Amino acid sequence: MALTQERKNEIINQFKIHETDTGSPEVQVAILTEQINNLNDHLRVHRKDHHSRRGLLKMVGRRRNLLTYLRNKDINRYRELINKLGLRR
């Protein structure tokens, strides 16, 4: 299921750095994580949905690249984000 605008705004408000922040790596990773979790739930029910699985893999790769960028840019922000999202890195 697609991410609703209300849920996206909640995520942005939770992870934003400044008042008009919508594109920081933290916000992007948080939104991608929510989408990945929703798609994982979908794929548990619809195991043969290979088109959605490919989209999931693309999202995971994009999130991985953003996390690598953030880790290289500011390790403290990276660690804080990982703890907030509950990612196992």
Swiss-Prot record:
MF term (GO), any: structural constituent of ribosome
Biological processes annotated in GO: translation
Signal peptide limits: none
Gene3D superfamilies the UniProt entry points to: 6.10.250.3130, S15/NS1, RNA-binding
Coiled-coil ranges (or none): none
A Pfam family annotated for this UniProt entry: Ribosomal_S15
InterPro entries in the cross-refs: Ribosomal_uS15, Ribosomal_uS15_bac-type, uS15_NS1_RNA-bd_sf
An example Gene Ontology CC term for this record: cytosolic small ribosomal subunit
PROSITE patterns associated with the record: RIBOSOMAL_S15
Alphabetical UniProt keywords: Ribonucleoprotein, Ribosomal protein, RNA-binding, rRNA-binding
Purpose: One of the primary rRNA binding proteins, it binds directly to 16S rRNA where it helps nucleate assembly of the platform of the 30S subunit by binding and bridging several RNA helices of the 16S rRNA.
HAMAP family assigned to the protein according to its UniProt record, in alphabetical order: Ribosomal_uS15_B
Recorded family membership: Belongs to the universal ribosomal protein uS15 family.
Subunit structure: Part of the 30S ribosomal subunit. Forms a bridge to the 50S subunit in the 70S ribosome, contacting the 23S rRNA.
PANTHER family: RIBOSOMAL PROTEIN S15, BACTERIAL AND ORGANELLAR, SMALL RIBOSOMAL SUBUNIT PROTEIN US15M
Protein name in UniProt: Small ribosomal subunit protein uS15
Source organism (scientific name): Anoxybacillus flavithermus (strain DSM 21510 / WK1)
